[in-house]
A protein has these predicted regions:
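Conserved C-terminal helix/tail region of periplasmic/extracytoplasmic solute-binding proteins
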Residues: 263-272, 279-371
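Short helix-initiation/N-cap motifs at beta->coil->alpha
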Residues: 1-6, 107-113, 194-209
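Extracytoplasmic/periplasmic substrate-recognition and gating elements
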Residues: 226-295
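Hinge/lid segment of periplasmic solute-binding proteins
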Residues: 25-82
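Acidic, glycine-anchored loop motifs typical of Ca2+
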Residues: 60, 124-135
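Early extracytoplasmic/lumenal segment of secretory-pathway proteins
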Residues: 1-25
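Glycine-centered hinge/linker elements that transmit conformational signals in sensory
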Residues: 115-119, 149-198
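Short, solvent-exposed loop/beta-turn-alpha elements that line the ligand-binding surface or hinge
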Residues: 41-53, 104-106, 132, 157-176, ...
Length: 371
């Protein structure tokens, strides 16, 4: 709050102190609603449709022709926070399973296939008859944010765009109920899956690096924590809902950057030029080094994982409701919250829909104002 408030005060005072704002994605939307950021589509020398900006994000986050913040190659945290699945090759071999790379490439890496590979992997290693972090598992999750990514992986959006350029919530659909039931069962009922509810990555990742979990659902940046892992591991995308789905999809967590130009900027054209140039330079000189040298060269243990990274990157997606969940009554966090609090999806939605719609429509109304 102090970060956002300090920035707001400066812009409202017309200080002209900032040419470019590297906004914290989770909260920067509060400045959009206050009319403090420029429409990036109107900034000369800035080209949001260029490949170094995330095009799926530009398409999803543009409403009524307005885009107030943009993620792109200007910051590596976009890619470090992208959701992926890691698999442990030692655990894979010990359970007589095949590497899932060909399954991914053939478009057959589905949720059902993922569940199938988990079956029978869990072991009560300490023999106490209770499930704990001392045991082994098919999959391990340390927070509800990874569960939240399944709605992206299943290629479903929380919103729908309307003919008048506006956007509306679309949470009351059977696919959301079905997704909730699948993920709730995964979190609370699957004997081969451990949900370290409220846990931290530091304690949970040890289960994976110590060969006690086949799959670890997390973010790509956590691969850097596995450099000293003795066993080899692979990186694959989250599974699709079915083979009929054309593309593997994922998203990047909201503790990343969103780049904005404030309305009190002294020279918007210059700010756009520098922002574009920085993003181009990072796209050509920083991101390739991170992927080819750090990830593909030092972290990824095989060429197949390097190929998987390209597939994952191509499916980076964003959801307007999830992107601005804090500003819209947590409507875009409905899946993670229902899972975390173990509440029936339909009941939770019916209890919250009036609040969701009111907060969401209020936020969207700024996009619909004529400027």
């Amino acid at each position: 709050d102090s970060y956002l408030n300090s920035m707001k005060k400066s812009i409202q005072a017309n200080d002209g102190a900032y040419d470019l704002i590297d906004g914290y994605a989770a909260v920067i939307g509060g400045a959009y609603a206050d009319g403090l950021m420029m429409n990036l589509h109107d900034v000369s020398n800035l080209r949001p449709t260029s490949m170094w900006w995330s095009q799926l994000a530009v398409n999803e986050l543009t409403v009524n022709g307005k885009l107030f913040g943009i993620p792109g190659d200007l910051s590596l945290n976009l890619w470090k926070n992208i959701h992926v699945m890691f698999f442990n090759k030692t655990v894979l071999e010990n359970n007589g399973l095949e590497k899932p790379y060909d399954t991914v490439k053939n478009g057959k890496w589905t949720y059902d296939k993922y569940l199938e590979m988990n079956v029978g992997v869990a072991r009560d290693l300490d023999g106490n008859g209770e499930v704990s972090l001392e045991d082994s598992f098919g999959s391990i999750y340390y927070d509800d944010l990874s569960f939240d990514n399944f709605h992206n992986a299943f290629d479903y959006s929380y919103t729908v765009k309307n003919d008048d350029g506006s956007i509306s919530l679309d949470l009351d659909e059977q696919i959301m109920v079905d997704t909730y039931e699948k993920i709730r069962s995964l979190a609370y009922e699957n004997p081969d899956v451990y949900y370290n509810k409220g846990g931290k990555v530091e304690g949970t990742i040890d289960v994976f690096t110590q060969n006690r979990a086949l799959f670890f659902a997390s973010v790509l940046g956590d691969a850097e924590k596995m450099r000293d892992m003795n066993s080899d591991f692979g990186i694959i995308p989250f599974p699709k809902l079915s083979e009929a789905q054309e593309q593997y999809k994922t998203t990047s967590r909201d503790n990343r950057s969103m780049f904005c130009i404030p309305t009190d900027v002294k020279d918007a054209d210059f700010a756009g030029l520098i922002t574009e140039a920085l993003c181009v330079a990072s796209n050509r000189g920083v991101v390739p080094v991170y992927y080819d040298t750090v990830l593909k060269g030092k972290v990824a243990r095989d060429s197949e994982s390097a190929e998987m990274l390209d597939i994952i990157r191509s499916g980076l997606n964003f959801d307007f409701a999830a992107e601005f969940a804090i500003q819209t009554g947590r409507a875009g966090f409905i899946l993670r919250d229902a899972i975390y609090y173990d509440k029936n999806y339909t009941t939770y939605y019916n209890e919250s829909k009036k609040m969701f719609n009111k907060a969401f429509d209020r936020f969207v109304s700024y996009y619909m104002e004529e400027k």
